[in-house]
Each structure stands twice: as C-alpha cells, then as structure tokens.
Amino acid sequence: MANERRNLIRWLLSGGLTASILSFLYPVIKFVMPLAVPEAAVNEVAAGKVQDLRPHSAKIVKFGSRPVLLIRVNETEWKAFSAICTHLNCTVQFQEPRQQIWCACHNGFYDLNGKVVSGPPPRPLEEFIVRLRGDEVVVTKQT
C-alpha cells in the first residue's frame, strides 16, 4: 500500500514537473521558431496622395503583410524601404531632425539610401521603387 502511494506521488510530481517545463518551453520555441506566414502576392501598393506627405517626412504603409517606410526626401525625391530592421526584425522609424532611419530596439541607424550608418544591423534595408501616377504615390517591389 505504501509503495503504491509512493508511485502515485512520484507519477503526479513528475507529471507536474513535465507540464511546468513544457508550459515554459512552448512559448520560447514559438518565439524562436515562428510559423511561416505565406507572403501575399503583392507587387505594388498605392501609398496615398502626393499632398498627404510633406517634404522631409515619412510614413509607414502596408505592403501585403509587411510594413514599408515611405520617405519624401524633398519636393521631388521619394524613397521606400522595408520597415523591418535587418538586426532583429524590429520596426524602424524615420527621424526627421537627423534625416535618418532609426531602429529603437538596439539604436541602429540607416541613411536615406537604406545603408547602415551605425549600430548592430548587419545589412542594408530592402529598397522598394517609388513612382508617381498623377497625384498618387505607388510603391513597387524591386525585381
């Protein structure tokens, strides 16, 4: 009888310990190895009207399921880059006073050509093509 009780207690404790370990490991594994989300077959998006974005400013637009940083460099020049930092996939933002792209996660900076200026990002941002169609701004994938 005492032996059966010990076995039951051992079984319950090992089951509880296993459940505790799995409840900790599951979110860690999901974070480290996220599910692959199929990329939407989008080749271009209408990003808004020319007059919606003043010179020396930027906004983030959706390109399928990915964010793209659209920058109006001056009256006539436009740039667009992936808004995903090449270091750890944080969302980047445009710093108007410095005229640079900044990743707040680890203080990485990119210039207006998407090239790394400082910080930990290992490679430049992916660039997109910007075209004007009348008063509409259109962002297209590089081929």
For the regions a language model picked out, list residue spans one by one:
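N-terminal pre-ligand scaffold of iron-sulfur
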Residues: 10-86, 90-97, 124-143
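Short, acidic, Ser/Thr-enriched surface-loop or helix-capping motifs
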Residues: 4, 73, 111
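Active-site and channel-lining beta-strand-loop segments
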Residues: 108-110, 130
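Twin-arginine (Tat) signal peptide motif
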Residues: 1-9
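Short cysteine/histidine-rich metal-coordination sites, predominantly Zn2+-binding motifs
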Residues: 99-107, 117-126
